[in-house]
């Protein structure tokens, strides 16, 4: 059972509708929680967490009561695998000591991404061909996460080939080895990247 942690209903920004459908396509069981629920943290069938996209903006160094639900489940499930998507990746970056670079305009659309050989992308055949590491992915964000240089355990695993400043920037991370990951793009947003979600689930179940 995957636990999806969000206070939102589906909308164009969080892509929850697409996330739910992608999981249903593989008959992956999931539970959605929209509040800090003491009953859920007692459950023994929760195998992993997904923190999906959100419509509101995450702020780097400003307390936000809206983030209480994410931190609640991260605290109470300290050893569970976690996948943060867009907003979820931003939350994890702050949780693990990184920061966010804020922009006034939205970064939205399909852009090229270089994928590493990380197991999250295992078995993936990129759009540019089997011998390429490059894929197109769907983005929708204002704040770009930046890994803390003082914490080498936070590892970059994918990169936007050309961001708004014309440079290459990390857009996916491994925060805790073989357990906690974040991607700034929406893998549920395009069929070509659905297998990232499936790889996350398959790895969880293979370790049960």
Region locations from a protein language model:
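Active-site metal-binding loops of divalent metal-dependent hydrolases
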Residues: 54-55, 89, 187
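Flexible gly/pro-rich beta->alpha loop and the following alpha-helix that scaffold active-site loops
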Residues: 21-83, 96
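Gly/Ala-rich beta-loop-alpha elbow adjacent to hydrolase catalytic centers
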Residues: 84, 88, 93
């Amino acid at each position: 059972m995957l636990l999806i942690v969000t206070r939102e209903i589906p909308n164009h920004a969080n892509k929850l509708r697409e996330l739910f459908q992608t999981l249903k396509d593989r008959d992956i069981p999931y539970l959605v929680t929209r509040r800090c629920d003491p009953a859920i943290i007692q459950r023994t069938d929760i195998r992993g967490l997904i923190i999906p996209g959100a419509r509101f903006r995450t702020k780097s160094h400003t307390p936000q009561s809206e983030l209480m639900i994410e931190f609640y489940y991260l605290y109470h499930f300290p050893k569970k695998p976690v996948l943060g998507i867009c907003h979820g990746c931003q939350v994890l970056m702050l949780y693990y000591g990184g920061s966010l670079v804020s922009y006034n305009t939205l970064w939205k659309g399909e852009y090229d991404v270089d994928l590493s050989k990380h197991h999250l992308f295992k078995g993936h055949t990129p759009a540019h061909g089997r011998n390429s590491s490059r894929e197109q992915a769907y983005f929708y964000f204002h704040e770009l996460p930046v890994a803390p240089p003082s914490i080498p355990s936070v590892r970059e695993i994918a990169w936007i080939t050309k961001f708004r400043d014309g440079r290459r920037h990390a857009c996916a991370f491994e925060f805790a080895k073989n357990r906690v990951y974040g991607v700034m793009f929406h893998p549920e947003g395009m069929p070509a990247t659905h297998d990232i979600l499936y790889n996350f689930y398959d790895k969880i179940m293979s370790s049960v």
